[in-house]
Amino acid sequence: MNPFLDFRPPISAADGLEDNPVGPHAVDSFSRNAYNWQTAQAGGGSIFPGATTCSGNFATDPKCLGSSQIFNVFSVNQDFRTPYFYNFNVNVEKSLGSMAVLQVGYIGSAGHKLSVMRDINQNGAFNAQYPNYGSIIQLNSIGTSNYNSLQTTLRIRSWHGLTGQLAYTWAHALDEVTEYRGVLPLDSFNLAQEYGSSDFDTRHNFTAYFSYDLPGSSHGPRWLTHGWQVNSFLSLHSGQPFNFNAGTQRPGMNIVGNPYAGVSHAFNVAVGGEPWVNPAAFCVPGSAGCAGTTDPAGNLSRNALVGPGFADVDVSVFKNIQLKERLRVQLRAEMFNVFNRKNMATGPGSVGSNGVVSDTIGDYNGAPGLGPGEPFNMQIALKLIF
């Protein structure tokens, strides 16, 4: 949109509101007959030893608790509401001559009433609100999130046979919990303590692709000297956040030193991976010799550390041969991760308790040798286009 009807750069803006349903499996089932799965029965014996009939209110009837195990409960808050997102963006676009366009924009979103799991009976048998029960997990719609980004794109079209695009994004995503029905907060009554970078937060992202049609030559047969095309794709992005010594969970930890002191970030065969953080910089609050707060939550906030970044360069060469008016053959030679860079896993669960990243990103995502960023590989293909 250019309201001035002149050569000023066009401006566009949009917003939108959309629901984000929690899915069909928000509630689990509850068995009214308490039985012990672990007890092995002799032949002919009852497979439900000590089972009692729960005929009353399961919250008050002692028979509903079972005879040997603390009863855990899953519930949904009676005030649960449908989560929703508010999306908004504004873009400015400017032509650079007749062959290039520059676009700069702000893209953002805000999530409200997101689903969050809480243990409303936390603190154990002696301090819990309902001591006859174990965990009382409750699904609530009290979570929030926000995403803010600056996105820039430069597009080049048919400039002396060159077509390409360069794009850079700076972004920051924050929330209290990223996964649907994700991990429990350290303190179910202090959700604000969980506010931090989202599990997928990627602060910097740069991509570029180029496609160049080589000019033909008058020397030699046309089918050999014409129809050549060279392509390249570049992808660079910073790492994603993680919690040290946590897997996908978040234990309370104190940070008592520089987590990167003495760490080279170089692959080390002796430890079977790439040392990323110094384990000596962390300790469990309240443990012997652990400085800092004794609060079980620790002083290390959620997703405060960032894992390895990613870099990948792919190159391909195409040869197009026109056979008939509506039929041509394309011979393709494609090379992936040309510089054979090791791209280690990033994000939640990628860094072990020894501070080492052991998996490559493809192995971590379940596609060893095939995913983006895996070791250098090459394929040759023949394609018929009609």
Model-based region annotation:
Residues 1-33, 39, 112-120, 231-240:
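Surface-exposed extracellular loop regions of Gram-negative outer-membrane beta-barrel proteins
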Residues 45-386:
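Short, solvent-exposed micro-motifs at the edges of structured domains
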